[in-house]
Amino acid sequence: MTKPIRRRDFLRLAALGGSAAVTAFLQACADAGIDPATVAPTIALPTPTTAPIQPTADTSPTLVPQEPTMTAPLPTAVPTQTAQDGTARIAFVKTTDRAGGVRQAVELLGINPVAEKSVFLKPNFNSADPAPGSTHPDVLAALVAMLKEMGASKITVGDRSGMGDTRQVMETLGVFRLAEQLGFDTIVFDELAAEDWVMVETPAGHWQQGFPFARPVLDAGAVVQTCCLKTHQYGGHFTLSLKNSVGLVGKRIQTVDHDFMNELHSSEHQRRMIAEINAAYTPALVVMDGVDAFISGGPHRGELASPGVILAGTDRVALDAVGIALLRYFGCRTQAAQGRIFDQEQIARAVELGLGVDTPEKIEFVTSDADSAAYAETIKQALLAG
C-alpha cells in the first residue's frame, strides 16, 4: 500500500511546477486509475552548483527520476561553514575528557546554528558495544547540555542500529534513562510509520531506486551529528561522519519490497553510496569523538588506539579527512591507509557532490592551547602527506 502524499508535499509540487505541473500530475493519475492522494513522494536531489569539479559521466545531471518528483527540501541547517577563501574550520582539542573536550571544541567554532530551533541529534548507536563501538554517554550528555545552553527549542535523539534491534541497543546503552534525566525526546527509526520515510535519489547515483531517508531529520530545524573514530571491516573502510549517516536510511520500509542495507553492503559501489546518503541533508554541527579509536576491525569491535582528541566542524569531508589522517598516524594498515586521503571513495564521491572541501590545503585547524596546537600541526602534516 502506498503512503498518502502530504498536503505540504503537494503544495511544494505546485510551487515548483505551477498549475500546469499539477494538472499534468492529476491527469496522469486519472489515466492510470490512481488516487492522487496515495502517490508516494520522491525527492530528487539537484546537482550541486558549487561542486568543486566539473560534471563527468559519473556525475551527469541529465539523469532524472520518473514523475512525479520533487526537489530536495531546504537544508535542515546552516550551510557547511567555510571561510571566504573556501577553507573549512576544524576545532581540534587534545584531551581524554570527553565532556570537557566536546564543550571546548564547539566553543572554538564560535557558531550557534541551533538557537530557537528544534534539533535532531544523530549519534552512533550501530551496536550496544562501548565507545568507540558506539557513542559514549559522556559525549551525548555533553552535547545535549550544550544544545540546551545554545537555545535549542527541542532536542530529539534517534538512530537505526546496524547490529541488533535498535530499541534494545538504545536500552542497553542507557539512552532512554539519559533522556529522562536530561529532557530530550527519542526516536527508534525501526519503528517509524510508512509516511515517515521519504525516498531520495541523487544525480547519477549508485542506489538502484534511491533510498528511504528518515523524515524527522528533514523536518528538524537543525541537525547535529556525533560520530566515532574507527575503521570499518565490512566494506566501508572507515566509519566517521559520512558513514554515520547510514543510520538515517531505512533497512526496509512498508511501501517498498527491498532490503536497502543488503543492497548497500553487497554493492561494489558501497563507499560511493555512503557519500550519496549525505546529499540528503546538511548538518549544522558535527562532533567526532577520537579519545579512543579502532585502527583495524570495526565498527563494533577492533584494535584499539587512544588518539586522545575531540574534533568539531560543519564540513563532513574535512572532518573525515582529518579522521583518516589520525587513523593512519596511529598505525592503521587497512584499506583506509591506502592511497591518498582525498582519493578514498567516500571522500571523492562526497567532493563530487559538493559536500565539502576538495583538497587538504583548505582545512584550517582551530586550537586554544599549545599542546593541541602542536598535536594539530603533526596531524596536519600527515593529512597533507596523505
Residue ranges and their predicted role:
Residues 2-5, 9-25, 29-39, 43, ...:
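N-terminal and secondary-structure boundary signal
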